[in-house]
C-alpha cells in the first residue's frame, strides 16, 4: 500500500491503521500514538485485517471505556505447544486511558497448577487433552488460542489473581524485532542482549549458563523482559512508530496473539490472525501443529519440513 500526499483516502487509511495497530499489537508495550502516516509495501493483507477490527474496539482494548487488565504471556518456543510454546514468564498489565503499568510479573514457577480442568471445555477438547491443560505448562496444548486464554484466565483467578479482561501472548522472536528498533539492553549479569542474540540467549544459552540453577534462569528471563518493557516505554515517538512497523512481521507469523473478554471486541479480533482462532466454518484451513511432550527444550535446535502430497477429510 503506497501512501502519498496527493491521495487523501489512502492517507486517512494509513493514519487509521497506525492508531489501530498501536491499540491492538502495542497496547501492552507502548502508549497510543495519535497521528502518524506510514508507508508499507508488503503487508497490505495484515493492514486490512487490523483495520477490520475498528477503532471502537481499539478504544476498548486501550482502556478508554474503562480500565483493562491483561495477562501478557511470554511463550517459550524451545518447548512447542499448540499456540507456540509453553509459558516461561508472564506479566499482569493494567491499561487506563492508554496509560500502561505492570502490576506484577514473574516466571511460571509462580503459577499454581490444578489436577482437573478449571472450567468446562468442549467434548472434543477433553477427548484430546484430558486434564493435562490444568497444568500451566500444558495449558496451551490446543492450537485454538481462545482455549488457552480461557484456561489461563481461570487458573489465574483461582490462585487469587484479579479479574482479567483479556490475554496477549508473544515469544522471543517478537522481542528481537523490538530490540532491533530500540537497541540493546544489558542483562542482570552484564551481558549485552541484542536483536541478533536474544532468541538464542533465551532458548539455548540460558539453559547452559544456569544448568544447575533453573530458578536463577527464570529470574534472569523475567529481568530481561522487564528491561525490554522499560526501554520501549522510554523510547521516542519516532522509535515507537518503527516498532509498530517492525511488529507487522511477527504478527504475520502468528507470534502475537490476543483474546478479549469483551464479546464485541473478541468477535472482531477472531476474524484476524491476532485471534489465533481455528475456525469450524468453511472455508477454513488444515494446520500442522507441533507439540513437544518430552519437556526437553529441544525445539530450538530442530529444523522441520512438512510435505503434503494428498489431503482429504471425510464428512464425519
Could you tell me what each predicted segment is?
Residues 2-316:
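Non-catalytic, solvent-exposed segments at the cell envelope interface
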Amino acid at each position: 500500500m503506497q501512501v502519498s500526499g496527493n491521495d487523501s483516502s489512502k492517507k486517512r487509511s494509513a493514519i487509521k491503521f497506525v492508531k489501530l495497530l498501536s491499540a491492538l499489537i502495542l497496547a501492552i508495550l507502548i502508549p497510543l500514538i495519535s497521528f502518524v502516516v506510514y508507508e508499507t509495501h508488503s503487508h497490505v493483507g495484515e493492514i486490512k485485517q487490523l483495520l477490520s477490527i475498528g477503532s471502537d474496539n481499539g478504544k476498548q482494548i486501550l482502556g478508554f471505556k474503562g480500565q483493562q487488565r491483561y495477562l501478557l504471556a511470554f511463550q517459550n518456543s524451545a518447548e512447542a505447544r499448540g499456540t507456540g510454546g509453553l509459558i516461561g514468564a508472564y506479566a499482569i498489565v493494567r491499561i487506563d486511558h492508554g496509560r500502561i503499568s505492570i502490576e506484577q510479573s514473574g516466571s511460571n514457577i509462580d503459577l499454581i497448577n490444578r489436577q482437573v480442568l478449571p472450567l468446562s471445555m468442549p467434548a472434543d477438547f477433553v477427548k484430546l487433552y484430558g486434564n493435562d491443560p490444568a497444568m500451566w505448562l500444558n495449558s496451551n496444548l490446543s492450537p485454538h488460542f481462545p482455549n488457552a486464554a480461557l484456561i489461563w484466565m481461570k487458573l489465574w483467578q483461582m490462585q487469587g489473581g484479579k479479574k482479567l479482561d483479556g490475554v496477549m501472548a508473544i515469544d522471543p522472536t517478537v522481542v528481537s524485532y523490538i530490540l532491533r528498533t530500540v537497541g540493546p539492553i544489558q542483562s542482570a549479569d552484564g551481558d549485552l542482549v541484542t536483536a541478533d542474540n536474544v532468541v538464542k540467549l533465551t532458548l539455548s544459552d540460558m539453559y547452559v549458563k544456569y544448568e544447575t540453577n533453573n530458578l536463577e534462569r527464570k529470574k534472569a528471563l523475567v529481568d530481561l523482559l522487564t528491561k525490554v518493557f522499560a526501554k520501549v516505554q522510554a523510547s521516542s515517538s519516532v522509535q515507537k512508530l518503527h516498532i509498530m512497523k517492525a511488529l507487522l512481521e511477527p504478527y504475520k507469523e502468528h507470534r502475537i496473539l490476543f483474546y478479549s473478554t469483551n464479546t464485541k471486541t473478541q468477535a472482531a479480533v477472531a476474524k484476524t490472525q491476532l485471534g489465533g482462532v481455528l475456525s469450524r466454518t468453511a472455508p477454513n484451513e488444515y494446520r500442522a501443529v507441533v507439540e513437544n511432550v518430552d519437556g526437553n527444550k529441544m525445539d530450538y535446535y530442530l529444523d522441520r519440513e512438512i510435505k503434503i502430497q494428498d489431503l482429504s477429510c471425510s464428512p464425519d
